[in-house]
């Protein structure tokens, strides 16, 4: 039995304290959900599983002044998560197009075998996409995005995409804006020192766990990858499995305390001010 639901739900309203330019910032999260799980457990569908689940709490335009900022952040989120199916469309239409494409791909794949000839096939296709708002400050918002896919085999694929937004501009903050080793005039000495900081933190992780060792790390590829978020007191770089680790180590988060990162930062950014100008 096919069941698809697509709806919008006002999920949360958060008030941010006054900034130097705005007396109040009101951010409304509108939750877009889509579920498709068409195969009931019957004799005809034993071993067949197909499901899509999407949960995207996107930013809504609470005021006219916020409209371009919220739209810019939505564009950044959906372009990364739903590519190539988002091209300025309404979010619900982009989500539907994305899911229809996955369903079509599953149908083509499932028809490759004839269950009447090969016995009951074990078709499993699970796709889940989610966003979680994490750190929320007066001037920044962190999102943690995850794309989970399992189409058979030994293990699923999970891709984590992190977003750090400047709420004053609607821009996604990148290494170029934040660090002195990036941008128009990169500092190679600073960059190399930053890489060594990352490697040093991984070595500490290896020493502190029995789950993996230094032999499970591809040390030549340890470097800033642009996939980072921030917490109240740390910078966190995320690497999916195979980027710098094997399946034994799995995905890895490199947590760098802000006092260690300070020497590499450009002053005056919203992140620098949040950490060091309180």
Task: Give the location of each predicted region.
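Bacterial Sec-dependent N-terminal signal peptides
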Residues: 1-28
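Compositionally biased intrinsically disordered regions enriched in Thr/Gly
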Residues: 20-278
């Amino acid at each position: 039995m096919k069941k698809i639901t697509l709806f919008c739900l006002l999920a949360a309203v958060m008030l941010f304290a006054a900034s130097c330019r705005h007396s109040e910032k009101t951010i409304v999260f509108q939750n877009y959900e889509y579920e498709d799980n068409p195969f009931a457990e019957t004799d005809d569908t034993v071993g067949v599983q197909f499901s899509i689940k999407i949960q995207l709490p996107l930013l809504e335009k609470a005021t006219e002044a916020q409209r371009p900022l919220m739209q810019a952040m939505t564009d950044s989120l959906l372009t990364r998560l739903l590519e190539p199916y988002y091209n300025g469309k309404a979010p619900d239409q982009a989500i539907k197009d994305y899911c229809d494409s996955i369903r079509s791909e599953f149908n083509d794949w499932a028809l490759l075998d004839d269950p009447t000839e090969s016995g009951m096939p074990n078709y499993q296709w699970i796709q889940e996409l989610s966003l979680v708002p994490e750190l929320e400050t007066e001037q920044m918002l962190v999102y943690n995005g995850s794309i989970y896919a399992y189409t058979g085999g030994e293990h699923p694929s999970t891709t984590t995409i992190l977003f750090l937004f400047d709420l004053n501009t609607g821009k996604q903050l990148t290494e170029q804006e934040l660090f002195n080793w990036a941008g128009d005039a990169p500092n190679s000495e600073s960059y190399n020192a930053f890489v060594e900081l990352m490697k040093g933190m991984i070595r500490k992780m290896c020493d502190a766990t029995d789950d993996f060792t230094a032999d499970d790390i591809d040390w030549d590829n340890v470097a800033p990858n642009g996939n980072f978020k921030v917490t109240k007191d740390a910078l966190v770089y995320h690497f999916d499995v195979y980027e710098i680790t094997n399946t034994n180590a799995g995905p890895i988060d490199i947590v760098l305390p802000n006092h260690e990162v300070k020497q590499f930062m450009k002053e005056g950014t919203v992140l620098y001010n949040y950490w060091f100008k309180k």
